[in-house]
Amino acid sequence: MGPITKFNWYDNSAIGTASPTPEQVNALFLTAFTADKGTEQMIRIKGEDFYKMYGSSLSFARHGQVLLQAGKIIDAGGELLCKRIVAYDATLSNIILTVQVTNVTKQEKYADTGQPLYIDAATGDTTTEQYDAELHENEKYTVTNTVIKWLADNSVTNCKTSDEVYEAAESLYQAYNQMPIDDYKQTLPEEERDQLFTDVSYGIYPLYVITDIGRNADVKSIRIVPKYEVSRRLGFMIYTLSEIEGATVNENVTVTANPNLIYNNVSYAITDKSMGELKTIPVSGMLEAYVTKLSELTGIPYEQLINMDVFFGCNIKGASIDGVTVDTDGIDISGEFGVKLASGSNGTEFDYNGTTAYYKSDAYAEALCKFYRGYSVQANDPFPYDDQIYNVDVHKIVACVDANYPIKVKNAITELADFREDFFVFRDYTTDVYTFADALDVQSKLKKTRFAADYLTTYDVIDPYTRKRIRVTMMYDLVQPLVVHFSNSPYAPFAGVINGFVLSNAIEGTINFVPVTTPEFDQIGLLDDVRVNYATYHEYNGDLTVVSLYTSQDAYTQLSYVNNVVAIQEVMRALRTACPRNRYRLQTGNDFSDYKQACSAVLKNFTNWFAGLAFIYQQDDLEADQKIFHAAIEFAFNNWVQSEIFDLYAIPTALVTE
C-alpha cells in the first residue's frame, strides 16, 4: 500500500420513524466555465487575480450562469480550482517579434533641394553636379548606415499552442536568412530597392514568440519601452515589458535584452515566465545572433553592445549609436497601444455571440465532462485534461456548485465526488423546471449519492454587469452563503435564516415553483419524501430562504443531511493534512500509539462539531508489519429543528385556574 490516507465510510446511523477555524483559510470550490480570455490550464485562483485572468466584465450572454457564479464565489472570499473551457478548434493569438538589421548604402541628397550629391573629381568636395567640366561622371556621394527595422505581419495562423508558433518562428529564420540577396530585395517596397547596392549585409531574426496564455479572440497587445534614466545609472539597458488590452495596461515587468545578465542575484532576462497574462518565449540563439550581426556591422564589440539598447539602436543614455538608425516604416514596438497579437479565435464549436446558447450544446457538455472526468476524449487534443483533479492530497476541495449544467455534466461531477468522497456537490434542476412532475423527471436522470444534494428553485435576477433580467437557478445566490458557511460553521445546517441561507437577489414573482399543501396535494410533503430541496418565502423576513438540506441518497440516515456529510469531510481533510507530517516517524515495535496521539490531537479540534466523536485505534500486527495505521472514527451528530408540531387543546373555562 502506497503512502496515502484512505477512508472507508460505514453508515450505522439509520433513523427511526418515531470549533476551531479550519486550517484551509479559503474554502476551495471546483468549477469550469468559458470566458473571454485566460489560461486553459486547471489552476487555483482567488481574489483580484480571478478578474485579471478571466476579465473584469463577466458576460452572462456569452458565458452563462457559471462564470458570474464563479465571480460571486471569489467576491465572497472563496478560492477556485477551475478550468477555462475552450472550443477544440479555437486558435491562439500570437506574434513573432522579428527584427531586421541591414547595412544600407544610399546616395545622400542635398538637404535644401533634395538633389542627389556627388563628389567632385577635381576638388573632392560634394556637389550636386552629376558631371565634371569634362563631362566625366562624378562619383556618387554615399553613406552606409546600419538600419534596424521591426517587421510587421509576423503572426502565425491556425496555431493551438505556443510550441506550434515557436516552430514557425524557427522556420521563419531559416526562410529569411537563406534567401539570396536579389530575392530579398524583391520583398521590399519598390521605392527602397534602389537604396541597396553591392555588398549589402543583412539579417532577419525572430527574437521572441509572444502568445496569449489561452486560445481566444485577439484582445491583447505587447509593448517594449526603453528606460534610459534608470539604465544610465545601472550601467546596462533595461526595458518595461507591458501587456495591454485596449487602452488599459494590465501588467508591467522590468526586463533586459541580455539573457545572461544577473543583477542583485536576480535575472531580468525575457523568458516564458516573465509575464502572467502572456507567454514571452525567446527563440533560441536569435538574440545572440542578432547582436553578433549588429556588432559585425557597427564594429562595436559584442560584450559592449549586448548591454546597450539593441532594440532601438541607442546607448544606455538614449543617444543614437553612431551610424545606426531605426526604420520608422517598421512596427513601433514602443507605441502607446503596443503591437497587437493576431490570429486568435474562439473557434466554431462555442459561438459566444450566436443566437443559440452554446452552453446548452453537446460540444460544451462533452468538454465539461472531459474536465470533470480528468481526461481527453480526443487523442490529439493539444490540451489534455488534468487527472490531478483526482489528487485529494493537493486539492482539498470542499464543494462543486452546479450552474445550470447539462444533465450529463451533473452526473460527471457526481461520479467524481463519489470517487473522491471528500467534497460535496450542490446540484440544480436546470431552469426548465416549473412543476413537481418536471422535478421528478430531472431527478430520475441523476445519480443518487450521499455526496450530492438537489435543489429545484429558479428565478430571475438583475445581471450586475448589464442591469438586465436573467434567468438563473438558486445556485447563483447559494454560493455566497456557502463560502461563508464552509469557512465558519460547516457542521451547522445548510438552510435557514439563522445560518444565512437567504437568496436575496431573487425578483419577486419570478420564482418557478413554491410548494404548498392543499386539500388535494401535499407538495411540501412530497418534496420531503423524494428529498428535493427548495427555497420559499417567509413572512417574517420577506426573503427567499433555503428551507431543506437533504442529500440525494436513497437510505434515510443521518447522512441524509448535508451538514452531517460535510462535517465528516472536514475531518477527513484535516487528517489528510496532518497525517503526512507524521508519516515515517520511527515507532516502538508494532505499537503506533504515538501516531494515534497525533491523530487524536487533530480530532480534538472537532469535538464541538458533534454530539459524540470517538477515535479507536485498531492495532493489528499484520497491518503494522505492512506499515499501515488502522483506526476507526465514530460520529454522533447534533440535532436541530426543521419542522414544528404544536398540539392545540380547547379546554373548558372551568378548568382554568388562577
Label each PLM-derived region with a short phrase.
Residues M1-A121, D125, E129-K596, V602-E623:
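A glycine- and small-residue-enriched flexible loop/hinge signal that marks low-structured segments
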Residues Y390, N608-E658:
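Compositionally biased, low-complexity/repeat regions
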